[in-house]
Amino acid sequence: MASDPTSGSTPHLPPDSLAWLTWGLLASLYFVGYFQRVAPAVMVDELMRDFSIAATLLGNLSAIYFYTYAAMQIPSGLLADAVGPRRVATAAAGVAAAGIVLFAQADSLWTAALGRGLIGASVAVAFVACMKLAGHWFPANRFATVTGVSLLIGNLGGVLAGVPLSEAVASVGWRTAMLASAGLTLVLAAVVWLWVRDDPSERGYASHAHPEALNNAAMSPRRSLKMVLSERDTWLLFFAGGLIAAPVLTFAGLWGVPYLVQVHGLERSHAAVFTTTMLLGFAVGGPLLGALSDRMGRRKLPYLGASLAHALGWVIFLLVDDLSATALTLLFAAIGFSAGGLIIGFAFAREVNHPGAAGTVGGVVNMAVLGFAAIQQSAMGWILDRNWQGDMIEGARIYDAAAYHAAFLWLAFSAVGAVLAVALTRETYCRLRFDSDD
């Protein structure tokens, strides 16, 4: 018979199995969000034909998800701090399902854009809620590791939106595939509401949260946001996260597949394998680099090393022609893996801010991750259209290697910017500055 966690004078901390299950169910919403984020990459031709659009408008349609996602990051963090991740995530999953249905049944570009916007705005809470929940269910010295696993789970959604979704689109059409994902999202909303709890104390266990984090009601949203935005390192980590993530989300999330199809002559499903490799590297890099940072007791050094490797990867991609399939696969995996270092930035940002503002700081940093990706996706489309030579196949524009090269230059510039931002941060040695200042 299992022992009562409340027996004795002091409740026990929650068992790892319960912590991972509770947190993992909520993290499933991040899986859904990531799937929806990169899904347009394998339906580029269908979307261009159905809505009669070129690259600029397609980039904008895909990027609307990122714009609304980014816009909701700070509100999501404030809500997670104020009312808890369970309520926020359940409501978000329901709204996401509605947005997916609207997108799948759209008969105009504007309706499709509204659907994509609803999806982005609703799943925006997922990552922030995961970080908020992790601070209550796991010890502080595992925060970067758990946050890294969030990235792994999310990227598995991206993997599902690669070859499997490509095959589903070819088999039943993009609209039916999207409707099926809406149904699964509704099921997830019910499961999160029934099982997830914001703090172990709701199940009779002791909490891992800092005492200040348990008194969120005493801190107004305005004060929380002011404290976070007044911290210098918050801004450096804001730019670092956005600039390192945007190239991967832009390439693997939208323009990588059409580039490989149009320039290298690959089949769409084969091209999706290459971009999926980048997402898999991203997925694996998050938890491994997060765990390395936790083990080293350092944040700046491993984050800087990952940022340098990421920038080098994009420079090689742009400068080295005629890479073999094997070399390109390894390069994409390395680019994705090194980008996973952005996970360290979330733990880093949490440590330089007040523990009662954990949700808010997560929202601020994550706003850059998605906001910068939105800007880059739209900018890539604009650059491609500016360099279009007039070729079309079955109603879809075809862009040559020079056009893509002009667009992809900005991926390398972005990665170099991330290196500079991380280099200017101050090390925390995996300790909360709030405690250090007491």
Where are these regions (language model features)?
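Extracytoplasmic gate region of multi-pass secondary transporters
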Residues: 40-42, 231-286, 373-381
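Cytoplasmic helix-loop-helix junction between adjacent transmembrane helices
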Residues: 115-153
